[in-house]
């Protein structure tokens, strides 16, 4: 006998602050507490977007192992303190350059950093360094980017300008996720489950914002899987060819990629999407300033248009 499948009818935040949330979901069929909890936990820890420092330029030094004249901290210590600053980026910008200029003895804090209107420092009292020389002027440029997950220096895209020090970036606003599964009774049966999910964040995003993003990521993946069972309508050949020609004639500025990736493409003479898809992945990899992250952006943007790198355009017309 086929029993009716039970879906949760109680989903609520048992506790919620800007940095902590405890979500309860019940009832779930046996085994689904772990299935749902584990999938959400993995996505929350690995795939939620955030902001982080990716490069620093400290005027007067050229590598992170330098001492800084007139400053108590060396470059490594100063950069470690900078990485503790929490930046909130609003709007569509993916990259911002911030400036810190401080002269004279005293402590330097995050509040000394000059930020544009779309960037907010959530912990302005974060200590950065102490200037010990009354005549010393500390000048720093800070590159802040949006990203996802943890990106080590080895995977960062090189910055052509001299003086920039690349920094390991932990973009994830989610610091810890845990879940617990308990039995719960529905009617006469006590074999159903209650899922309790705990989320700890750094304050750049709230637990419910992170949860919403995680659900959206999972939802998109399941929708793509569902599409394989949907019969796709046949597109007349002439219409398909005309649509392709229209896409290829578009400017690369129509692509959903970062300004940095866009500038890198323009530097090598690529102005249209047609120019871009003629290039192979290996050709782009060998191009200066197009690293792993930019390449992934480009491939994803082309995929959204039904295109890919290395296309033989002539045979498709």
Swiss-Prot record:
Query: Which molecular function GO terms apply here?
Result: DNA binding; DNA-directed RNA polymerase activity; protein dimerization activity
Q: What is this protein called?
A: DNA-directed RNA polymerase subunit alpha
- Superkingdom classification of source: Bacteria
Q: Which SMART domains match?
A: RPOLD
| Complex and partners | Homodimer. The RNAP catalytic core consists of 2 alpha, 1 beta, 1 beta' and 1 omega subunit. When a sigma factor is associated with the core the holoenzyme is formed, which can initiate transcription.
Region listing for Alpha C-terminal domain (alpha-CTD), in residue ranges: 245-317
- Its Enzyme Commission number(s) read 2.7.7.6
* UniProt region (Alpha N-terminal domain (alpha-NTD)), positions on chain: 1-229
Known function: DNA-dependent RNA polymerase catalyzes the transcription of DNA into RNA using the four ribonucleoside triphosphates as substrates.
Q: Which InterPro entries match?
A: DNA-dir_RNA_pol_insert, DNA-dir_RNA_pol_RpoA/D/Rpb3, DNA-dir_RpoA, RBP11-like, RNAP_asu_C, RNApol_insert_sf
Keyword list (alphabetical) reads: DNA-directed RNA polymerase, Nucleotidyltransferase, Transcription, Transferase
Write down the species: Aquifex aeolicus (strain VF5)
Pfam families documented for this protein: RNA_pol_A_bac, RNA_pol_A_CTD, RNA_pol_L
Q: Which reaction does it catalyse?
A: RNA(n) + a ribonucleoside 5'-triphosphate = RNA(n+1) + diphosphate
According to the UniProt entry, the note on domains is:
The N-terminal domain is essential for RNAP assembly and basal transcription, whereas the C-terminal domain is involved in interaction with transcriptional regulators and with upstream promoter elements.
Q: Into which EC class is this enzyme placed? A: transferase
The record's annotation in SUPFAM superfamilies points to: C-terminal domain of RNA polymerase alpha subunit, Insert subdomain of RNA polymerase alpha subunit, RBP11-like subunits of RNA polymerase
